[in-house]
């Protein structure tokens, strides 16, 4: 076996998994309309998004610990097989409770990113790990761009079609893993430890670190604000602009591409010229302005130029992450990244519930209030930024 084949297989697994997730994004509200009253679609959509994120948050450390104990391959294969069956069940869900159970199972089986990351760490040397983790992120990003486009095209025929396609992709993933994916964890198997199963344990180390805690609060708020389009883009596009599933899929892909390009090509030059602190502030201003403009947009075409502004707002998060990384020693970088990942998962739980509730409460008067609320949340960053940026982080951030 060629030494790079396991890497290619695991990266393909990550990409196909992301495509499967993205496939159902444009059509989930349409599927809900077949099961609940139209006035209840927004509330159930938000709960389903939050439920999926909650299961990922709770189960990611569990799957990671199980892979340490029993190996990466069996955990991945069981998850992929479960996902294939789950998507097939959701495609034919006759009742709402079946769809809820399906999203719970999808969240559990979808929490395999930690296992895939551990697999890559097993098969690569230290000097190559950063590059290969970059490949992993790129493959996931590709899947999340391609998935909504394909899902939107399929959704034009039936809201059930993308679910069947996602089931088929996970089935293909499972078969590929069975025949081509060897076990990577061949060292000593670690016993299960209770603390390894606790997703909240990653926050304890930061207690008493004033600057880090302040900047992590900013990180949480920014990630929470980022949940506005994640929770509302599909429903808002349908209600305000009367988009169909195909248009929604294209818009999601366009947004993903623009956001990725902005982070890859703009963040570095802007941070180098203005400093990380100003890049962070510029990103928040661009994002908040985009939200306000989108709230008042009256035609579907207006959303596409506004996307450029929203994508430019994406430069703020990498700048903040760089500032945070400067505040901790090398031996704590892993803990920092784990804490940031946990915070991201928490916002994926809270955000959909919060913003779909605001949207549902205001839809009969004006459905732009949720975007205004998201922009207003950036104001909560100001006290934490004042404490974090001007008490030591600011001097480092502009170096």
UniProtKB/Swiss-Prot annotation:
Xref: PANTHER family: FI18259P1-RELATED (PTHR23507:SF1), ZGC:174356 (PTHR23507)
Function: Resistance to tetracycline by an active tetracycline efflux. This is an energy-dependent process that decreases the accumulation of the antibiotic in whole cells. This protein functions as a metal-tetracycline/H(+) antiporter.
CDD domains: MFS_TetA
Family recorded in the similarity comment: Belongs to the major facilitator superfamily. TCR/Tet family.
Membrane topology: Multi-pass membrane protein
Principal place of residence: membrane
Record-level GO BP terms: proton transmembrane transport; response to antibiotic
Localization per record: Cell inner membrane
Keywords: Antibiotic resistance, Antiport, Cell inner membrane, Cell membrane, Hydrogen ion transport, Ion transport, Membrane, Plasmid, Transmembrane, Transmembrane helix, Transport, Transposable element
Lineage: Bacteria, Pseudomonadati, Pseudomonadota, Gammaproteobacteria, Enterobacterales
GO cellular component: plasma membrane
InterPro entries registered for this protein in UniProt: MFS, MFS_dom, MFS_trans_sf, Multidrug-R, Sugar_transporter_CS, Tet-R_TetA/multi-R_MdtG-like
Bilayer-spanning residue ranges: 7-29, 44-66, 73-95, 99-121, 133-155, 160-182, 203-225, 245-267, 279-298, 302-324, 336-358, 368-390
MF term (GO), any: xenobiotic transmembrane transporter activity
Organism expressing this protein natively: Escherichia coli
Pfam families, alphabetized: MFS_1 (PF07690)
SUPFAM superfamilies hit by this protein: MFS general substrate transporter (SSF103473)
Protein name as catalogued: Tetracycline resistance protein, class A
Protein's UniProt keywords contain Membrane: yes
Gene3D superfamilies given in the database record: MFS general substrate transporter like domains
């Amino acid at each position: 076996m060629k030494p790079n084949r396991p890497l290619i297989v695991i990266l393909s697994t990550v990409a196909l998994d992301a495509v499967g997730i993205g496939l159902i994004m444009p059509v989930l509200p349409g599927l809900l309309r077949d099961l609940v009253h139209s006035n209840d679609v927004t509330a159930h959509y938000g709960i389903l998004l939050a439920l999926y994120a909650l299961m990922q948050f709770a189960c990611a450390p569990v799957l990671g610990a199980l892979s340490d104990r029993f190996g990466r391959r069996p955990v991945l294969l069981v998850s992929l097989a479960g996902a294939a069956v789950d998507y097939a069940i959701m495609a034919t869900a006759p009742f709402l409770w079946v769809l809820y159970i399906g999203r719970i199972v999808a969240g559990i089986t979808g929490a395999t990113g930690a296992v895939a990351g551990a697999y890559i760490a097993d098969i690569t040397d230290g000097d190559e790990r950063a590059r290969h983790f970059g490949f992993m992120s790129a493959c996931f990003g590709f899947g999340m761009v391609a998935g909504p486009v394909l899902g939107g095209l399929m959704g034009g025929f039936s809201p059930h079609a993308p679910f069947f396609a996602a089931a088929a992709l996970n089935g293909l993933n499972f078969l590929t893993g069975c025949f081509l994916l060897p076990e990577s964890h061949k060292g000593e198997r670690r016993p299960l430890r209770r603390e390894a199963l606790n997703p909240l344990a990653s926050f304890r180390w930061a207690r008493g670190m004033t600057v880090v805690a302040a900047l992590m609060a900013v990180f949480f708020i920014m990630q929470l604000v980022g949940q506005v389009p994640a929770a509302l883009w599909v429903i808002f596009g349908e209600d305000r602009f009367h988009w169909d599933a195909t248009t929604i899929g294209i818009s999601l892909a366009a947004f993903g591409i623009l956001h990725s390009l902005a982070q890859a090509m703009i963040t570095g030059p802007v941070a180098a010229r203005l400093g990380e602190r100003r890049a962070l502030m510029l990103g928040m201003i661009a994002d908040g302005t985009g939200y306000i403009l989108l709230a008042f947009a009256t035609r579907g075409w207006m959303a596409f130029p506004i996307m450029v502004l929203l994508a430019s707002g994406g430069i703020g998060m990498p700048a903040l992450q760089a500032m945070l990384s400067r505040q901790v020693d090398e031996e704590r970088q892993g803990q920092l990244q784990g804490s940031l990942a946990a915070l991201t998962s928490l916002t994926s739980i809270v955000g959909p519930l919060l913003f779909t509730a605001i949207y549902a409460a205001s839809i009969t008067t004006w459905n732009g209030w949720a975007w205004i609320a998201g922009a207003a949340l950036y104001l909560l960053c100001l006290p934490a930024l004042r404490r974090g940026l001007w008490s030591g982080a600011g001097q480092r951030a502009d170096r």
